Amino acid sequence: MTIKSDKWIRRMAQETGMIEPFEPGQVRQSNGQKIVSYGTSSYGYDIRCADEFKIFTNINSTIVDPKNFDENSFVDVKSDVCIIPPNSFALARTIEYFRIPRNVLTICLGKSTYARCGIIVNVTPFEPEWEGYVTLEFSNTTPLPAKIYAGEGCAQVLFFESDEVCEVSYKDRGGKYQGQHGVTLPKA
């Protein structure tokens, strides 16, 4: 597997709609203000967080069970910022919609700007032929509230092209998160 360059990312986004909307360069300012960067980088693509959040709450004193997840464990927020309570987390989604080619696997890593503040972004790989909006998980590891900015960069996607095409893709398997829209909760 080889990591793909900015040139390949631009070509695939423009020719196949691999990333929509797509920013061919690196955006570091908006309306004259510094922002957490997004867009195409040398060997990756910095994704943005949309303005839809699900903030974890323990008001129902429930057990967190990935096989039987209680939707009441979250408070829905639509805003240009998300305040995550201390030692808690929030779910969000990307602005970008992805269509991953059959011979490509991605790895998504959090941006250091957030990590240096104790905010960890977790996203699993995007498998071959997966498509949809990416559900993001932000963990606030600090004892203080933490702020996430919608419309700004939050993680970087690295694209790896295989030397041969997989026999069975995510789409072929009927993956449970295929074509997801909005912030998607766990599915067993």
Swiss-Prot record:
Pathway(s) of this molecule: Pyrimidine metabolism; dUMP biosynthesis; dUMP from dCTP (dUTP route): step 1/2
Coiled-coil ranges from the UniProt annotation: none
EC number: 3.5.4.13
Family from the record: Belongs to the dCTP deaminase family.
GO MF term set: dCTP deaminase activity; nucleotide binding
Keywords linked to the UniProt accession: Hydrolase, Nucleotide metabolism, Nucleotide-binding
UniProt GO BP: dUMP biosynthetic process; dUTP biosynthetic process; nucleobase-containing small molecule interconversion
Annotated source species: Herminiimonas arsenicoxydans
NCBIfam families reported in the protein's UniProt record: dCTP_deam
Subunit structure: Homotrimer.
Stated name of the protein: dCTP deaminase
InterPro entries in alphabetical order: dCTP_deaminase, dUTPase-like_sf, dUTPase_trimeric
Pfam families the record matches: DCD
Residue positions of the active site: E137 (proton donor/acceptor)
Chain positions recorded as dCTP binding sites: K111, S112, T113, Y114, A115, R116, T135, L136, E137, Q156, Y170, Q180
Function of the protein: Catalyzes the deamination of dCTP to dUTP.
Catalysed reactions, semicolon-separated: dCTP + H2O + H(+) = dUTP + NH4(+)
Top enzyme class: hydrolase
